[in-house]
Amino acid sequence: RSRGLGDVYKRQVVLLSAAMCVAALGGCGSKAGSSSDSSKKTAENSSKEDDQKAADEVAKKIDAIYVQERNDKTDEQCKEAKEAWDKLTDAQKELVEGENADPDYFGRDTGDASQDDPLNEDNIGEKELLVVSFGTSFNASRAADIGGVEKALQVANPDWSVRRAFTAQIIINHVQARDGEKIDNMDQALERAVKNGVKKLVVQPTHLMHGAEYDELTETVNSYKDKFESVKIAEPLLGEVGADATAINEDKAAVAKAITAEAVKTAEYDSLDAAAEDSTAFVFMGHGTSHTAKISYSQMQAQMEPVSYTHLTLP
């Protein structure tokens, strides 16, 4: 019996020792796994930090040119911003966020920039028709709308050289940085005209009315007046502002008829009367302005009334 109990005791000791070894080995394995997981998380965090750092650097470069007035560093900064963007991964591009910067600055598809002609070449001649627009960074719209106006003016005035200028440097910088297309601002366009020996200059704005942009345009052009034999600045689309809210003119009448006809056509009615009979009203909306020219909206509303556009309104 003594030997039997001893054998049992020995077996228990052996089993307990084996269990302790297994537990010890299991514990060692758990620590190793925990260490591996920790290293993996550290690497992931480090990678995320690196991604954000790269994105932040691009955001700084975009912010630097976003609202920058043109200077001797603009060209290089536009180039550097785009090159830095191109080096980012798709995931890093989504992280770009600054005061003004976001992924759309370089990442949004607005059409083929090569379809747009910036009209910034020399060999102008003595007569120039300078078409001045606020501008847009949407390539397809710029080519079709602004480019369409420029082309129409060139066809109508074959003896004149048509050139382009934008008043919004924020747009000029954006297009140059993203697409490599250089568009003249007002000073660049006027300096180009002087350099090319232009004698007769006609400035045709595509602006809607006598607002802040138009005021700045006329101020800039007037500062160059003594460099040309003659300078003429055309009225904006809605013509002169007028004395009060009831003042209307031929320009406003032409615009009222044109936009009404287009609205009726787009709504697929045969006539304005047909739209009225169908209880359809048209509402035309403007951007609005704090400039004194805001009265132009009231004048356009007044313009609708004499031609029986009773179901047309401008809010």
Which positions does each model-derived feature cover?
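Sec-dependent bacterial lipoprotein signal peptides
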Residues: 7-26
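Bacterial lipoprotein signal-peptidase II cleavage site
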Residues: 26-37
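Beta-rich interaction/scaffold domains
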Residues: 46-108
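Extended amphipathic ligand-handling, pore-lining, and cofactor/metal-binding catalytic surfaces
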Residues: 104-312
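Low-complexity, Pro/Thr/Ser/Glu-rich flexible segments characteristic
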Residues: 37-49
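Single conserved hydrophobic/aromatic residue that forms the stacking wall/gate
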Residues: 1-9, 311-315
